[in-house]
Amino acid sequence: MAPLPPCGPPRSPPPRLLLLLLLLSATLLGAPARAEPAAGSAVPAQSRPCVDCHAFEFMQRALQDLRKTAYSLDARTESLLLQAERRALCACWPAGH
């Protein structure tokens, strides 16, 4: 196997290549900003649901869930209080009367 030639200092790319890469990158980066939507593919603003509407609907459902949970906890608490009162009342009455 033949020995590899010694490496020299790295060569800089030719100026034309740098200019071409610069123009290509500027074109690619600027393309999305200037791109026009294809005809017929744009959704009119009136038919697009907004983010605020989705957030409002989510908060409405969360509030309904919280109300149901609060009602359930309230009913359970009332049931437990009635049981405790009944036990306390029954403990006061003599067994023979």
From Swiss-Prot:
Residues 1-35 form the signal peptide. The keyword Nuclease does not apply. GO terms for cellular component: extracellular space; perinuclear region of cytoplasm. It is found in: Secreted; Cytoplasm, Perinuclear region. It comes from the Eukaryota. Coiled coil: none annotated. Its main location: secreted. Pfam families: Neuropep_like (PF15161). InterPro entries: NICOL. Keywords: Cytoplasm, RNA-binding, Secreted, Signal. GO terms for biological process: 3'-UTR-mediated mRNA stabilization; spermatogenesis. GO terms for molecular function: mRNA 3'-UTR binding; transferrin receptor binding. The keyword Secreted applies. mRNA-binding protein which interacts with a range of target mRNAs including SERPINE1, ACTA2, CCN2 and COL4A1 and may promote extracellular matrix production. Binds to the 3'-UTR of SERPINE1 mRNA and stabilizes the mRNA, possibly by competing for binding with SERBP1 and preventing SERBP1-mediated mRNA degradation. Also binds to the 3'-UTR of ACTA2. Testis-derived lumicrine factor that triggers epididymal differentiation and sperm maturation. Belongs to the NICOL family. Interacts with NELL2; triggers epididymal differentiation. Interacts with cell surface receptor TFRC; the interaction mediates uptake of NICOL1 into fibroblasts. This is NELL2-interacting cell ontogeny regulator 1. It comes from Bos taurus. The gene is NICOL1.
